[in-house]
């Protein structure tokens, strides 16, 4: 008879352990998190080639963004 009681207690413990293990992770604060900044290594690796679209000089491998394109020369027509 004590085998059944021990088995029942073990099953209840396993059930409770599974409930705790499967519980949802609490939500973190709803404040917007600031995205990580790129390190200098990744900034250099991710530079765009000549002719690629760009927003500013820092995105181009030549450091010249003209008319939203990476350029080779300053005065390109």
Curated annotation (Swiss-Prot):
Keywords associated with the record: Antibiotic, Antimicrobial, Cleavage on pair of basic residues, Disulfide bond, Secreted, Signal
Keyword Signal: yes
Propeptide: 23-37
Disulfide bonds: 54-65, 60-70
Pfam families per the UniProt record, alphabetical: LEAP-2
Cleaved signal peptide residues: 1-22
Coiled-coil intervals, chain numbering: none
Locations listed in the record: Secreted
A single GO cellular-component term on record: extracellular region
InterPro entries: LEAP-2 (IPR009955)
Swiss-Prot/TrEMBL GO biological process terms: defense response to bacterium
Family: Belongs to the LEAP2 family.
Role summary: Has an antimicrobial activity.
The name this protein goes by in its record: Liver-expressed antimicrobial peptide 2
